[in-house]
């Protein structure tokens, strides 16, 4: 597998407080990685550094052998797509127009190409958004908006997907379908890195799990190694029972 990201002592300090301790990590293509940990653990900060959205970070964060901060924005956008926790659209764009915005890094003129339209059609089919393609984005439910934004970044045809809680607002059916889609994208060669609070989704679909606590990466391994009662208690402060599915994946139970 080809290495895409190389982080060496990458961290972040705000107003004298170290919100992400220096971390040394490598990320390769064809991988689905989950970032888990309590609120304020540094997950979104790490993702933001990788997305080129945290200027002034400590250490090094290189993508494709070049420091993220030195990439031209348009060229970087063709390589790396980022999905934030929420997106605001103030103007009356349809869902399809929002998805077409994902093609912006490729547009050289005023009109979209046949390739642009094909990429949008495919992305909307994958995310089950075709049925409301003509609706005003602002009128969509939270889950519909989230799927539309995901379609937009898939239309971008990147090598890397960085997602900050991609299943926020989604019902159970679409949570599972989106994670299956992300896993399939990883199997097709993409690097997918997703922040999640759902440990069972992380366990079921991720190749690798990074655990963050108080700004520090404390575990980095396969879900089977990471998601155990001891780690869950130490990081999240809750007692849990971990069973295993027929496929050997951890399944976490809470409560008595």
Annotate the PLM regions.
Residues 59-67, 76:
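Conserved ABC transporter NBD signature motif
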Residues 51:
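Helix-to-loop junction immediately C-terminal to a conserved catalytic motif
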Residues 136-140:
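Conserved ABC ATPase signature
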Residues 36-38:
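The feature captures the beta-strand-to-loop junction immediately N-terminal to the Walker
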Residues 100, 114-132:
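Conserved ABC ATPase "signature" region
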Residues 235-256:
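ABC ATPase nucleotide-binding domains
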Residues 161-165:
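Catalytic Walker B motif of ABC-type/P-loop ATPase nucleotide-binding domains
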């Amino acid at each position: 597998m080809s290495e895409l990201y190389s982080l060496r002592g990458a961290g972040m300090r705000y107003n004298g407080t170290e919100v992400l301790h220096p971390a040394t990590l490598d990320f390769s293509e064809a991988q689905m990685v989950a970032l888990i940990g309590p609120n304020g653990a540094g997950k979104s900060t790490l993702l933001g550094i990788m997305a080129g959205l945290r200027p002034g970070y400590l250490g090094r964060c290189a993508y494709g052998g070049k420091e993220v901060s030195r990439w031209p924005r348009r060229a970087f956008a063709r390589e790396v797509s980022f999905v934030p926790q929420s997106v605001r659209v103030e103007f009356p764009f349809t869902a399809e127009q929002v998805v077409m915005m994902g093609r912006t890094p490729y547009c050289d003129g005023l009109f979209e190409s046949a390739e642009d339209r094909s990429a949008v059609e495919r992305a909307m089919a994958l995310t089950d958004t075709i049925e409301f393609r003509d609706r005003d984005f602002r009128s969509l439910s939270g889950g519909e908006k989230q799927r539309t934004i995901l379609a937009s970044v898939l239309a971008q045809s990147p090598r890397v997907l960085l997602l900050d809680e991609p299943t926020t607002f989604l019902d159970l059916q679409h949570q599972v379908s989106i994670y299956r889609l992300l896993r399939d994208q990883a199997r097709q060669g993409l690097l997918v890195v997703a922040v999640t609070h759902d440990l069972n989704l992380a366990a079921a679909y991720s190749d690798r799990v990074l655990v963050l606590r108080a700004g520090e990466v404390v575990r980095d391994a396969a879900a089977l190694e990471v998601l155990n009662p001891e780690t869950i208690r130490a990081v999240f402060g809750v007692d849990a029972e971990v069973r295993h599915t027929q496929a050997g994946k951890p399944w976490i139970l809470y409560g008595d």
